[in-house]
Amino acid sequence: MADEALAGLDEGALRKLLEVTADLAERRRIRSAIRELQRQELEREEEALASKRFRAERQDNKENWLHSQQREAEQRAALARLAGQLESMNDVEELTALLRSAGEYEERKLIRAAIRRVRAQEIEAATLAGRLYSGRPNSGSREDSKGLAAHRLEQCEVPEREEQEQQAEVSKPTPTPEGTSQDVTTVTLLLRAPPGSTSSSPASPSSSPTPASPEPPLEPAEAQCLTAEVPGSPEPPPSPPKTTSPEPQESPTLPSTEGQVVNKLLSGPKETPAAQSPTRGPSDTKRADVAGPRPCQRSLSVLSPRQPAQNRESTPLASGPSSFQRAGSVRDRVHKFTSDSPMAARLQDGTPQAALSPLTPARLLGPSLTSTTPASSSSGSSSRGPSDTSSRFSKEQRGVAQPLAQLRSCPQEEGPRGRGLAARPLENRAGGPVARSEEPGAPLPVAVGTAEPGGSMKTTFTIEIKDGRGQASTGRVLLPTGNQRAELTLGLRAPPTLLSTSSGGKSTITRVNSPGTLARLGSVTHVTSFSHAPPSSRGGCSIKMEAEPAEPLAAAVEAANGAEQTRVNKAPEGRSPLSAEELMTIEDEGVLDKMLDQSTDFEERKLIRAALRELRQRKRDQRDKERERRLQEARGRPGEGRGNTATETTTRHSQRAADGSAVSTVTKTERLVHSNDGTRTARTTTVESSFVRRSENGSGSTMMQTKTFSSSSSSKKMGSIFDREDQASPRAGSLAALEKRQAEKKKELMKAQSLPKTSASQARKAMIEKLEKEGAAGSPGGPRAAVQRSTSFGVPNANSIKQMLLDWCRAKTRGYEHVDIQNFSSSWSDGMAFCALVHNFFPEAFDYGQLSPQNRRQNFEVAFSSAEMLVDCVPLVEVDDMMIMGKKPDPKCVFTYVQSLYNHLRRHELRLRGKNV
């Protein structure tokens, strides 16, 4: 029945009942009921969280269920009306504003769906407009497109036939079956040429060719290459010059399937770039262009399938003074696509432009898609499907005065695995020096930059690694300066050993390990190579680039290296281990305490603690011997101390054997001591027995035994340690007083042990206070008989004294705001506890309500100055020191000052009591 009554109560009522209940069995039942209530509450919360789209009001509205049903019906009707309104809305900005103002999840879901629908319609319209604007016939058959592609690829062949054949063998595709997990690497280079570039420009944008390997036919809808002629030419030329014509080379439009795509377009020297808007579905890649006045749009796309693992070979790449060997890396693929293809793009604008040179081929690790498209600075939009990647670039750089290169990360979603890889655009400043390819003597594959002050250039790299394994991604940025080579690792696992090569000068690498770090480089003028380590080595996709000196980082690197070396050198240096013999020679506990605080080694701390125990034991033994000596001296002194009346009775009983061979003597001495005020009585009984036996030859043996019994009684009131007053008159340190105190200690200790815990602590505190008072009292004429502390009588250690002081401070500051005294460190950090302590004794000294925990300095100054002025308590800790120590001041400093404050305030309190009496 009692359990049922408890089950009907809430947790607050049960806790109040627990506070007033003393029966252990009843308290156990109440605690069980509280635990059951908490368990039920947790279960309800777990069920609510497990339910989809949890709403708290639906759970709490159980009493008005009908109204809740009506409200849900109204919400459904409102959603239906909203869906009808959204069908007629085609403005993305209006829908976005509506989305921001919507508060319900279902409404926001409908608005997001409408925004996706409108964007899809815009993309379709832009794609159609781009097709119509390009003037390219869309009704051409697959065979016509195939022939056109072959014809244009044949026009762009380079003289190096050996490298062409070798590259064609390397890049020969291997079909990958659908439905299997494969790695897809996407490298997108967006180059925007200045509109008014002339023949005086040192370099102009040129895109890299692709390998002329046999390609299977692909669907035209999946790979479109839209181009426009230079202003003034309505139609693109059917057969442009091979390598020296200033007119742009047209790119073939190949049919597209799930296999490979080769679309080659080169940007002309006088073309205005157009924006590119890629849209990728879950299993294919679609390219669509945003409608608008775009004179030129060209792209380069290569998609090759993954080769079997056993066919992958490691071919070293010649890179400056050292060789960079990484089999099947993105670096190898880009070298193959840009430098080793049968087509070489050479643009001439008054002066010969940079040409592409072959490099040593390397086998591909997996399928890769490389796209090079001039990007417009005015607009760029992208739309993502369930697993697509989008990048929007609408920022342009103006002239040489623009900021340094910025690395930005854009979120993207990939595949069913859901692994996101950040696509980081790189904005470069125009006018930088021309960098060289990694092969000595080779012309640069991509050269960008202008010499005009008003010119602008934008290069964007989008690197996408699609992996079926769904591995976690990490990033690392390596930023050198000067002639050094910067290496940027995007979103992949770092290799165990990262190799870096430089074309000349010193090589200094600063490693920044945070993946999301924004790094600023110098004016990057040339992308030298790409590098991707195979999955077996968990390598990263690296972009290497030449950079102008932006700021001297070498000093910082050297400083960091020096600091590291300093730490390494300092590590072996340590203090010699302490020995037990050295510690035994230390006689000061304070020194050992400091050593214990400063030591961090476990063995040293163990030795120091052992030495502390030994030292304390020696001091205890010394105190015991001193006490025995004083007892003997007190026994030899005649008379009793002043203020006491003593009565002594001695009884002696002797017994002799009949033959006289043995004598037994018993002496009993009773001493009764009364204090003059009649509050204390001490009784001491001493029994001495001796047994003497004589042998026949005259020798004898004596055995003596002494027993002492002491008892005392006191009618003095026992109270709290803080309510007792000091003794005004000193007392005599006689033998009777010592014996009486010893008996009182034993009696009060037994009483404290028999009481409950709260009463035991109070009795122990009262006993300690009384012992300290009695120990301080003594005869002025003779030596003061101080009571020595001993663990046998329960005398507290330092921790208990600190706890007693904390209890006193809590009692005096109870009820003050912003005061919660739990320790001698953080509880005193804002100064409010000091102010409350002083204000409790001197309410008229200052207005406590005007103080604030935020104004720490004022609190310390008010408390310290008031205590010094009112009770002459010198501030043992400075205000500046407390401010410097912050939220966790030194406990020893705080304890020392609080102890001094306690002594002065207690004296003031006792003086007030004496005046009132």
Swiss-Prot record:
Phenotype when changing residue 763 to V: In a colorectal cancer sample; somatic mutation
Residue stretches of biased makeup (Pro residues): 233-243
Biased amino acid composition, Basic and acidic residues: 329-338, 617-640, 738-750
Highest taxon listed in the record's lineage: Eukaryota
Tissues and organs where the protein is expressed, per its UniProt entry: Smooth muscle; contractile or vascular (for the long form).
Keyword Transmembrane helix: no
Keywords: Acetylation, Coiled coil, Cytoplasm, Cytoskeleton, Phosphoprotein
Biased composition (Polar residues): 177-188, 298-326, 676-689
SMART domains xrefs: CH (SM00033)
Region (Disordered): 157-456, 560-580, 617-767
Gene Ontology MF term list: actin binding; structural constituent of muscle
Domain Calponin-homology (CH) span(s) in chain numbering: 799-906
GO cellular component, one term: actin cytoskeleton
Biased composition range(s): Low complexity: 193-210, 220-232, 244-258, 363-392, 701-720
Chain positions with Phosphothreonine modification: 351, 360, 373
Phosphoserine modifications at: 299, 301, 304, 341, 357, 503, 514, 523, 576, 729, 792
Coiled-coil region list: 24-89, 603-630
CDD domains: CH_SMTNA (cd21258)
Annotated compartments: Cytoplasm, Cytoskeleton
Modified residues (N-acetylalanine): 2
InterPro entries: CH_dom, CH_dom_sf, F-actin_Monoox_Mical, SMTN
A Pfam family recorded for this sequence: Smoothelin
Function: Structural protein of the cytoskeleton.
Family: Belongs to the smoothelin family.
PANTHER family for this protein: CALPONIN HOMOLOGY DOMAIN-CONTAINING PROTEIN DDB_G0272472-RELATED, SMOOTHELIN
This protein's name: Smoothelin
